[in-house]
């Protein structure tokens, strides 16, 4: 709605708690995968208005927009910019943050070229695209007992492949791609909304690039000064989790 020359997005207050990590179970994981598959099936039938087609179109055979976007994000981290980040982190950050950020920057130096090549190698893969949440992760999935009672914050929703949602969600719920729960989760999803070989490939590379770039995003926010001292402990936890997830990705 529009009020006082501002646009407001209004959403109902959903019951439940984002507590999967505190109480993980196969039943809960299956519940969110079945729900997400149903959401995607409905979204695939969405018919956008002429005005909304830029953001919310559907297409049965198209390249994932996320691939080009992530290639651009990688290209923006030039060697000079990485060197500047290393110098700034060494100078300005306390030890726990400094050590974790420098580890992430080291991973980035070693791996960004390979990740970029994998993204580029899939740009010719054509898959169905339709509105996807694109930022569906642990804290946006609310549980009441074993039931999913809220899937919140659709602000990032835009047309893309279902692999954007699946890689983001499973990366945040499970992390390690070698955890058997990844296979179980995708099997459950596949029962409601079958995945193609191309979509499976996209899930993997979007997870890989998402982990790498999310670490750089937090580092950039720290360098810009947009993180308050009160936020730093939680940001450090996020960065350490990203580094742990990235270590598991090296086995892929």
Regions inferred by a protein language model and the residue ranges of each:
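Active-site acidic catalytic loop and adjacent metal/ATP-binding pocket
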Residues: 113-164
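Alpha-helical scaffold segments in carbohydrate-active enzymes
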Residues: 35-38, 42, 73, 77-80, ...
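Active-site activation/catalytic loop segments of kinase-like enzymes and analogous catalytic loops
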Residues: 162-194, 209-226
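An alpha-helical support segment within catalytic cores of ATP-dependent transferases
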Residues: 48-49, 80-133
């Amino acid at each position: 709605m529009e009020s006082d020359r501002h646009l407001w997005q209004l959403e109902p207050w959903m019951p439940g708690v984002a507590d999967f990590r505190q109480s993980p179970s196969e039943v809960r994981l299956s519940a969110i995968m079945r729900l997400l598959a149903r959401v995607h099936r409905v979204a695939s039938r969405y018919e956008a208005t002429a005005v909304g087609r830029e953001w919310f179109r559907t297409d049965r055979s198209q390249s994932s927009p996320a691939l080009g976007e992530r290639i651009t994000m990688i290209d923006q981290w030039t060697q000079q910019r990485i060197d500047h980040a290393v110098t700034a982190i060494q100078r300005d950050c306390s030890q726990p943050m400094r050590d974790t950020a420098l580890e992430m920057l080291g991973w980035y130096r070693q791996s960004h070229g390979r990740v970029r090549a994998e993204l580029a190698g899939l740009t010719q893969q054509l898959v169905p695209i339709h509105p996807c949440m694109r930022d569906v992760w642990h804290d946006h999935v609310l549980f009441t007992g074993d039931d999913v009672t809220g899937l919140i914050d659709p602000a990032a929703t835009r047309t893309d492949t279902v692999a954007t949602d699946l890689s983001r969600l499973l990366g945040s719920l499970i992390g390690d791609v070698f955890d058997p729960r990844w296979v179980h989760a995708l099997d459950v999803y596949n029962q409601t909304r079958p995945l193609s070989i191309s979509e499976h490939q996209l899930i993997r590379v979007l997870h890989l690039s998402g982990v790498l770039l999310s670490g750089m995003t937090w580092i950039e926010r720290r360098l810009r000064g947009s993180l308050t001292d009160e936020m730093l402990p939680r940001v450090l936890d996020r960065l350490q989790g990203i580094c742990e997830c990235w270590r598991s990705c090296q086995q892929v």
